[in-house]
């Protein structure tokens, strides 16, 4: 097929082939997932050929059906152009720059313009999560958190007081995530609990949901899979239709994969996919708490990598993990080669390394593993967790092969840093 096909056309082919479906089998899968009758076999075969060749783009009916059949969301295959917020929005949105906001914070007056300026500042900081060095983001996040919490002691209207509590809750959640990335576990847990309390005090159920998602994340990196499920239950009870709930389903799926329950993995992935498909596309793709639909590939990749353990290298699980990893890197890298999602890309490279080991390609596996460790912006507990899987796979298949010794040494250094 033409290599110049659209990305979505290549993806349809890759998803179908990873499942070892021929085109008639793909058609039957579409029928099984459709709520309405589909045209005859000959008509659908022509459609599938035109989709995979890139000659025609599936319409509004078939795009979500194809995504559902492949266990993902429409926007993961056909991305919507989303905004990337810049610092200029601080001025454009609130009519004030940072200096003016700080000056007015020191005064006794807190009006709607100040609240809006703070909201945009918090959104900007949340949008810096994938790129800004952890130390700098912690410094700024904590500074703004102190400023906002200090304001809570002033005489405020009930609405302004509630809004400030909510903004403080979002900042606390962000700071807690960065603290955990840097392996400051006690501080991260304390900040997570502060975010939970601020969410409860402000009545912001989304913050409550994210505080529980953080609990699930912390738990899975410690190997506490039952803790993940408990956090997901609490988060879904508090914010059942939120973006946090989507990510909690993903954490559940990852936990079930590690427990070894394939059926529950599929159930959790499908529940999360269905909820994410219903939610509006994020206004800002960089926002840490937005849940970019493309991230669903990232979670599916993790699950199928785990499910592929002990299976043939050409198994559906391993082929899906490989395909998802390639999609994660492609989506997380812009046209100039700059990585928009460096932490996701690192875990995707680890996945490709694990698949390479299963295919008997040690040199390729080590190359992917080393590349994953080179990122400037890292979530050390998560990276250590998945890299450990690659290290274990290399050791199981190749023992103490000298060509892998340097990578395994680097991996031990990472594990030491992540403790």
Can you annotate each of these PLM segments?
Residues 55-76:
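DNA major-groove recognition helix of helix-turn-helix/homeodomain DNA-binding modules
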Residues 1-35:
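A short, Lys/Arg-rich alpha-helix, primarily the initiator
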Residues 31-58:
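Recognition helix of helix-turn-helix/homeodomain-like DNA-binding domains
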Residues 78-98:
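Short, charged recognition helix plus adjacent turn
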Residues 30, 52, 62, 70, ...:
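DNA major-groove recognition helix of helix-turn-helix
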Residues 71-84, 296:
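Short C-terminal boundary/hinge segments that cap the last helix of small helical domains
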Residues 1-4, 106-115, 119-419:
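Conserved binding/catalytic microenvironments
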């Amino acid at each position: 097929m033409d290599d110049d096909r659209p990305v979505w056309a290549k993806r349809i082919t890759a998803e179908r082939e990873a499942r070892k479906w021929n085109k008639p089998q793909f058609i039957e899968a579409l029928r099984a997932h459709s709520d309405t009758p589909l045209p005859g076999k000959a008509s659908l075969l022509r459609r599938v050929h035109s989709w995979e060749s890139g000659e025609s783009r599936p319409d509004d009916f078939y795009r979500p059906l194809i995504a559902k059949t492949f266990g993902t969301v429409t926007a993961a295959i056909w991305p919507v152009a989303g905004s990337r917020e810049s610092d200029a929005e601080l001025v454009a949105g609130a009519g004030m720059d940072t200096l003016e906001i700080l000056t007015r914070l020191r005064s006794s007056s807190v009006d709607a313009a100040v609240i809006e300026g703070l909201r945009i500042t918090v959104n900007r900081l949340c949008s810096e999560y994938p790129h800004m060095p952890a130390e700098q983001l912690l410094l700024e996040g904590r500074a703004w958190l102190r400023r906002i919490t200090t304001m809570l002691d002033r005489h405020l209207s009930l609405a302004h007081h509630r809004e400030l509590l909510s903004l403080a809750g979002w900042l606390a959640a962000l700071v807690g995530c960065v603290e955990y990335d840097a392996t400051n576990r006690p501080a991260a847990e304390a900040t997570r609990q502060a975010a939970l309390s601020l969410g409860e005090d402000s009545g912001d159920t989304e913050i409550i949901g994210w505080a529980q998602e953080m609990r699930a994340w912390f738990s899975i990196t410690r190997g506490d899979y039952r803790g993940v499920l408990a956090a997901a239950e609490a988060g879904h009870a508090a914010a059942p239709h939120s973006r946090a709930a989507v990510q909690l389903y993903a954490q559940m799926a990852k936990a079930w994969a590690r427990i070894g329950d394939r059926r529950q993995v599929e159930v959790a992935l499908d529940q999360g996919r269905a909820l994410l498909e219903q939610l509006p596309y994020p206004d800002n793709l960089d926002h840490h708490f937005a849940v970019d639909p493309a991230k669903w590939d990232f979670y599916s990749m993790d699950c199928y990598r785990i499910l592929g353990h002990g299976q043939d290298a050409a198994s559906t699980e391993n082929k899906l993990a490989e395909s998802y990893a390639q999609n994660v890197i492609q989506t997380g890298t812009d046209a100039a080669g700059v990585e928009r999602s460096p932490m996701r890309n690192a875990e995707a490279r680890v996945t490709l390394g694990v698949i390479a080991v299963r295919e008997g390609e040690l040199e390729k596996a080590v190359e992917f593993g080393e590349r994953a460790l080179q990122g400037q912006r890292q979530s050390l507990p998560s990276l250590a967790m998945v890299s450990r899987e690659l290290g274990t796979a290399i050791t199981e298949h190749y023992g103490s092969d000298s060509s892998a010794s340097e990578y395994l040494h680097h991996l031990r250094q990472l594990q030491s840093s992540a403790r």
